[in-house]
Amino acid sequence: LSELDKVLGSELLSYATQPVTLLGSSIGTWRHACLSQPHPAAAIQRLQKAYLYQEYASTRPTPQEVSQVAEVMLQEALGQDGVKDLLQQNRFRNAIITARAKGITRGKSGLPLLAGMTTAMALNILSRRSLGLLFDRVAFCHAELEEVPFTQGFNTQRVALNEENLIPALKASGAI
């Protein structure tokens, strides 16, 4: 998808005459963060390189190591001023969607995690809206984005993006 993102960032989205909302979760939000940079194709290229060449100290990395490597990838992709650039530009209004576990879904590993995710799967089959019993939706949003799209029927907490929460929000969106 990196080649498509380069075309989107350098060609198609550069013609936008009004602000564009970039709403997503997981790796999509990482790509949106790159598209929001002054030189989006270069940021996408850095993300691709960081992703392809990520390294771990062991063959079975701990969750902490995975989190640390993900943070390094994001910092490499965005560059030295990328966080400030994303927050200060007004062309793209990022909305980073995350889910905060509650109740039985708060298990971190093993049987508690399996029980929580199995419960979530069963509730999702019955009704997607019932997932609100197990998760809170948190949308980390650009300061200029007043309303988060596609949240009807879901309890969504809006949090303004800032320099301290951008990287953690991107990681949380990917469940890292």
Predicted regions and their residues:
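Patatin-like phospholipase
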Residues: L1-T21, C34-I176
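Catalytic nucleophile serine of serine hydrolases
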Residues: S26
